[in-house]
Amino acid sequence: EAQADSPSFLVAAFYAFTSLSPVALESLLTDLPELARREQVVGSVLLAPEGVNGTISGPDQGVTAMLECLRSRISLGDAHFERLQVKRSRCKSQAFRRFKARRKREIVSLGQPCADPRRNVGTYVDPCNWNELVDDPDTLVIDTRNSYEVAVGSFVGSLDPATDSFRDFPDWVEQHLRPL
């Protein structure tokens, strides 16, 4: 049972690159807002043919119901959404004003039709090995966040492509990394 001064709302952030059929996408766009209303959940869920990306907030049972809905209807190839690690935190008041489920062309806007994050992925780095990797002088770290976010803080020695949006990153790669 929650104490009176402890945060009472659960916040869940999640994403998955997986194929969503047009039927599954439309069904979720219809069903998620109704479920969110019923469960008093607010936030945003982006749905695209390449997957799902969202952050939601609400009572524990409401957030759990939303995640269960997604788990039951989204497959990650031979894995299931239930095996996806959802990042959870708590807050004292609702983190968002309303709930929106939206259709997008991409869940991460890159604007490159040949880029398919469901098929072309890098090497997974275990968190235990992260510091060793970024401290290696042969590792090139590029901070792909926008200029404002990089100004707040970045990894020591990382390259700042000075982009306004992640969508600008492919052009920067063509101009600066392809010649290497």
Model feature map: region roles:
Residues 1-180:
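Cytosolic catalytic domains that perform sulfur/thiol-centered chemistry
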